[in-house]
């Protein structure tokens, strides 16, 4: 995108790191051709590959648009006539009839044309990546039988990119899946506070429509609430549905409470019951039998007003045992549903364990757990957009009905009836403003991938932070294998936002399923069944690491299993139904990338998972020495690496593109992204990892992206770490770094900022982008070209002009001389002011790209804009004091000191360590994983050789017996290197070039003080830890101001870096000044340094002229206080010490105006001033 990039493309040399090998031992890497040879400590064979990590997004959108791939999958699943989401909406809407029923309009066959522009062009030109949607509309005149059919354009429909994102107005966005309570019937149990009786209630919750609630109160009567209105006896509703007293007695005669309710019910028959319900629902309106009948029918039995949705119908049938085995057709309530719900409630209250339904089926009678994943479902992207289209279509329906009545019947065509504006507006509103359509997190590939797999309980129709209690936020046994128990935010959203587990998938009803291996008669098979949380509760499940023999039988007679509600016990192997497919089944992608997760406290693991998403792409990426085997799949599915689509031979390679000659004779060119800006200002750059003539297979990674190396996720650096205190400089999580990391750009990152300016038409004339700027020296204009735009490659710092622009000034009455000049020189003498785009305060860098859009070149620009210029400035940020670093175990800290390399502690062979962490950061935080990672990192870096067959190495595979230095390893979560294996390998490491082993078998080494050369008194843990540089950079936080913008009302400086604000001297700081008796300092702080508007200009003048500081005046906030008191009708006057009234002058002082004019400054800038004007 950015032409003329002058940044060096740092590519790692092939000798630097181990090269690709097609036979990686990790179960994950082995399935990808050309995967790096990462040897794995995994002991378990996984029968199932990790599914596509973006399927939750892509499959859902394919359902919405009815894509061919989705149709094939649906037919294979057994759906006779699969319907896409758009088709469903059109079928619901059709036909739209006029009020008399003489005309109707129906819609069918939604289809898309080609997308208007490719993804890159949409990002570049602020366009939406969308395809035109067409439907077939059919108008039928029922009086004449005339049919008119037309293809109607329904607006541009945003399309999903291959990466599962949307491009809306040039920015990449993600639609987050929403966790909501499923429609259905829910039984609850509460204890009455006064009588301590157990009360029961039931809610019938639809997808759309009125709620129906039944309950048994403390007087043992059964009541009903319709649409949250007043409670009335349940028999009133039954009578309104046409039941007689005899029928009620016959069905519910077994229940005393139903009989007592019937006795207390004083309505005589169906008509009275209907009128009674009508009075409760519509108080104040005159009731009639017909209106009451219509109201009840509309509330629950008409599809237009009431919709349980397929999932609600499925849940009701399942709970009440109705229509077993029948296909789901209706989505409204039925009389049978209401009666069965009441019977279930009554039997629940009477403590009966089961209920026999009319079909002879027995269903268990029990209350529901609302937080169970059998009762919570996902609204994925397709359903969220479908709901929004439904809203737009219903608005359009009203317009169509009105037009049917007003237009001439002969002239009506579908096109004249349809107004697509409400539909287009509804879709735009959803993508632009919905809480679930979010600006994509593009800090690094992992953060983007995690964002697409996020599950949110917030949003429209969901929970709110304030109302959500502890239960809904807590980890639930049914989350196992569905939602990660670790990865969730730390703040007010904790537990409300989660992440999909690695193997989880979403079924057609929106429930999350997780896979299990079928166990038959104690033999574990490779047959995979996906189970929802409800189905899993009915089975006995063994964990993935249960020992099994060669024939697949459980090695032990009794197996550790879990049953319903997460109860854990030992049972005979013959009772086991299923077994987990993988130990990492319960965690998310980010959590699965934490090695030795099983040794970390959950709170710290949560921080580790979250902080990996904040890692900044470094200039040189480096894959971890100690990984988990998840790095490759995560990087490929994140979509930031380039993958070969077909097998073939590399024909040509350059920094910008790779050409592959496929085996089928076709040629494919892959373009690299070069130094593009991500949504978060980090640098997205791709570079080839293949050479011309190399053979590549389909699915092989041929170019690395940001934060990847050899196709694996590489978020940080492997650094030599010593865990020890050092002169107190690493107290309280501070970190000491070696200057080598600064000098050799080890932790250097590139950040790209985008600066934009447009030239508009104003009331006084058009703005102009030009080099001809008033009152600016040639030095300032040196880097601008003839158009007034900065040249590529220019070094700029804050205040420098990036794009010159002048805006016409408001004209005053012209003098005769000015009129003469205007007559002679024409427009040239017009007054203009400098409104150029300048580098904001505190920023600097190198200009790496410029984009110019102009109306003259037929570029699409907003109304009133003639020209738009974007300038991209790249900044190379070396690591510095105040930057935040973190490991993968929640071990984070701020750099407290950067020491010269020669002062760092060093190993006996003279190797200085890179980073010193404090020992106190480990014990109380209980993240021991970082210590084990450090030890294994040293083993991997040094290489190892295991002689003989020691007891601890019995279970190690052959490839782990010996390895050369720099061997990358993986230790999968819950199936990684054991403590005794680690201890054994530490004593088998290869010696260095002098034949010495630096680190002992306990993982410690004798370190020497770099300043004195003396050894430290105790051995120190030394090894390699994977350290990430986080997005919290000191350069973004440090801020200084002398003068700047002030608040309009109080005239006090604004606050915060973004507003170029000042430092607040608050109430407690004033007390400190009072305590020290610093009266003059305090007076200065409260007046001339704050909001004494006249005083601050006079002080500025005195400083410039070298005079003494004048007396302060009256602060503006005091005048505001007076005005507030006067607004309360209090007459407040300011008196001098001798009782004379002091007049507070309004407006600006004459002295102020004179001084400001003489100095050529404007110190009373208000908050409307932009930061650019301050430089």
Swiss-Prot record:
Pfam families: RNA_pol_Rpb2_1, RNA_pol_Rpb2_2, RNA_pol_Rpb2_3, RNA_pol_Rpb2_45, RNA_pol_Rpb2_6, RNA_pol_Rpb2_7. It catalyses: RNA(n) + a ribonucleoside 5'-triphosphate = RNA(n+1) + diphosphate. It comes from the Bacteria. GO terms for molecular function: DNA binding; DNA-directed RNA polymerase activity; ribonucleoside binding. One of its GO terms (biological process) is DNA-templated transcription. Belongs to the RNA polymerase beta chain family. DNA-dependent RNA polymerase catalyzes the transcription of DNA into RNA using the four ribonucleoside triphosphates as substrates. This is DNA-directed RNA polymerase subunit beta. It comes from Mycolicibacterium paratuberculosis (strain ATCC BAA-968 / K-10) (Mycobacterium paratuberculosis). The gene is rpoB.
């Amino acid at each position: 995108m950015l032409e003329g990039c002058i940044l060096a493309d740092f590519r790692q040399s092939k000798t630097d790191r181990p090269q690709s090998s097609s036979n990686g031992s990790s179960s994950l890497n082995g399935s990808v051709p050309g995967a790096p040879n990462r040897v794995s400590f995994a002991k378990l064979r996984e029968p199932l590959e990790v599914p596509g990590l973006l399927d939750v997004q892509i499959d859902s959108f394919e359902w919405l648009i009815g894509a061919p791939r989705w149709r094939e999958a649906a037919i294979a699943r057994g759906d006779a006539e699969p319907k896409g989401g758009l088709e469903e909406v059109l079928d619901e809407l059709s036909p739209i009839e006029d009020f008399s029923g003489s005309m109707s309009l129906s819609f069918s066959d939604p289809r898309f044309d080609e997308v208007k522009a490719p993804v890159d062009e949409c990002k570049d030109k602020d366009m939406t990546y969308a395809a035109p949607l067409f439907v077939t509309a059919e108008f039928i005149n029922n009086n004449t039988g005339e049919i008119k059919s037309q293809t109607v354009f329904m607006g541009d429909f945003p399309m999903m990119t291959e990466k599962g994102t949307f491009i809306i107005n040039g920015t990449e966005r993600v639609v987050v899946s929403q966790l909501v309570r499923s429609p259905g019937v829910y039984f609850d149990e509460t204890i009455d506070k006064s009588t301590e009786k157990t009360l029961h209630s039931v809610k019938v919750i639809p997808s759309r429509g009125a709620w129906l609630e039944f309950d048994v109160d403390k007087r043992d009567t059964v009541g009903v609430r319709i649409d949250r209105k007043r409670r009335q006896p349940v028999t009133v509703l039954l009578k309104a549905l046409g039941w007689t007293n005899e029928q009620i007695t016959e069905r519910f005669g077994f229940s005393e409470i139903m009989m007592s309710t019937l006795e207390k019910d004083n309505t005589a028959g169906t008509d009275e019951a209907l009128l009674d319900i009508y009075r409760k629902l519509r108080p104040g309106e005159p009731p009639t039998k017909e209106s009451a009948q219509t109201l009840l029918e509309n509330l629950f039995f008409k599809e237009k007003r009431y919709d349980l949705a397929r999932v609600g119908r499925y849940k009701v049938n399942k709970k009440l045992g109705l229509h077993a085995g029948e296909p789901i057709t209706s989505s409204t309530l039925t009389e049978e549903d209401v009666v069965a719900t009441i019977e279930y409630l009554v039997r629940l209250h009477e403590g009966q364990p089961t209920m026999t339904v009319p079909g002879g089926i027995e269903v268990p009678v029990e209350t529901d757990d609302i937080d169970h994943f059998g009762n919570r479902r996902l609204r994925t992207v397709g359903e969220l957009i479908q709901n929004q289209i439904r809203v737009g279509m219903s608005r359009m329906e009203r317009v169509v009905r009105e037009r049917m009545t007003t237009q001439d019947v002969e002239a009506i065509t579908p096109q004249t009836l349809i107004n697509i504006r409400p539909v287009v507006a509804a879709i735009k509103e959803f993508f632009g403003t919905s809480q679930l359509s979010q600006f994509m997190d593009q800090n690094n590939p992992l953060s983007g991938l995690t964002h697409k797999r996020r599950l949110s309980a917030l949003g429209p129709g969901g929970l709110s932070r304030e109302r959500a209690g502890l239960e809904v936020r807590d980890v639930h046994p049914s989350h196992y294998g569905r939602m990660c128990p670790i990865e969730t935010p730390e703040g007010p959203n904790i537990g409300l936002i989660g992440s999909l587990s690695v193997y989880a998938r979403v079924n057609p009803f929106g429930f999350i399923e997780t896979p299990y291996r079928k166990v038959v008669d104690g033999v574990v098979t490779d047959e995979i069944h996906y189970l929802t949380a409800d189905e899993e509760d009915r089975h006995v499940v063994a964990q993935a690491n249960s020992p099994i023999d060669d024939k697949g039988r459980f090695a032990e007679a009794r197996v550790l299993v879990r049953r319903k509600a997460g109860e854990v016990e030992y049972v005979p192997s013959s009772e086991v139904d299923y077994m987990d497919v993988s130990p990492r089944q319960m965690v998310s992608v980010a959590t699965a990338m934490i090695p030795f997760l099983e040794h970390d406290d959950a709170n710290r693991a949560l921080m580790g998972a979250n902080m990996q998403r904040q890692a900044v792409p470094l200039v040189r990426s480096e894959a971890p020495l100690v990984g988990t085997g998840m790095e490759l799949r995560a990087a490929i599915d994140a979509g930031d690496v380039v993958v070969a689509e077909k097998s073939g031979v590399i024909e040509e390679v350059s920094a910008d593109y790779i050409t592959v000659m496929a085996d089928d004779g076709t040629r494919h060119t892959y373009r690299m992204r070069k130094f593009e800006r991500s949504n978060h200002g980090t640098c997205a750059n791709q570079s080839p990892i293949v050479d011309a003539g190399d053979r590549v297979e389909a699915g092989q990674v041929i170019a690395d992206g940001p934060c990847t190396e050899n196709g694996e996720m590489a978020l940080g650096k492997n650094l030599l770490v010593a865990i020890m205190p050092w002169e107190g400089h690493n107290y309280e999580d501070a970190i000491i770094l070696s200057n080598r990391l600064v000098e050799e750009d080890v932790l250097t990152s590139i950040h790209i900022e985008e600066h934009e300016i447009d030239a508009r038409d104003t009331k006084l004339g058009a703005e102009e982008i030009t080099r001809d700027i008033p009152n600016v020296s040639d030095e300032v204009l040196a880097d601008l070209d003839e158009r007034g735009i900065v040249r590529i490659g220019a070094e700029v710092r804050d205040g420098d002009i990036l794009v010159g622009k002048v805006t016409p000034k408001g004209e005053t009455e012209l003098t005769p001389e000015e009129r003469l000049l205007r007559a002679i020189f024409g427009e040239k003498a017009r007054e203009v002011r400098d409104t150029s785009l300048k580098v904001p305060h505190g920023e600097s860098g190198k200009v790496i790209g410029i984009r110019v859009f102009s109306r003259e070149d037929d570029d699409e620009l907003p109304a009133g804009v003639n020209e738009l210029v974007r300038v991209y400035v790249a900044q190379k940020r070396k690591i510095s004091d105040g930057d935040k670093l973190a490991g993968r175990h929640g071990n984070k800290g701020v750099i407290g000191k950067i020491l010269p390399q020669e002062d760092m502690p060093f190993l006996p062979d003279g190797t200085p360590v890179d980073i010193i962490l404090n020992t106190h950061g480990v014990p109380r935080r209980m993240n021991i994983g970082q210590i084990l990672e450090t030890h294994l990192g040293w083993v991997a870096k040094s290489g190892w050789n295991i002689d003989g067959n020691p007891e601890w190495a019995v279970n190690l595979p052959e490839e782990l017996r010996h390895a050369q230095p720099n061997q990358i390893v993986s230790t999968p979560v819950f199936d990684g290197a054991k403590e005794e294996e680690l201890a054994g390998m530490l004593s088998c490491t290869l010696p260095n070039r002098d034949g010495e082993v630096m680190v002992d078998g306990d993982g410690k080494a004798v370190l020497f003080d770099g300043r004195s050369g003396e050894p430290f008194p105790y051995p120190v843990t030394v090894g390699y830890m994977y350290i990430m540089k986080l997005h919290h950079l000191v350069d973004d936080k440090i801020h200084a101001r002398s003068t700047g913008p002030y608040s309009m009302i109080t005239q006090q400086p604004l606050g915060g870096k973004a507003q170029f604000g000042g430092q607040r001297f608050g109430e407690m700081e004033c007390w400190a000044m009072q305590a020290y008796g610093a009266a003059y300092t305090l007076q200065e702080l409260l007046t001339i340094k704050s909001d004494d508007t006249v005083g601050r200009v006079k002080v500025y003048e005195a400083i410039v002229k070298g005079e003494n500081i004048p007396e302060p005046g009256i602060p503006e906030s005091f005048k505001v206080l007076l005005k507030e008191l006067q607004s309360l009708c209090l007459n407040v006057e300011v008196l001098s010490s001798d009782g004379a009234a002091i007049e507070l002058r309004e407006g600006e002082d004459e002295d102020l105006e004179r001084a400001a004019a003489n100095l050529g400054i404007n110190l009373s800038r208000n908050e409307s001033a932009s930061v650019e004007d301050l430089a």
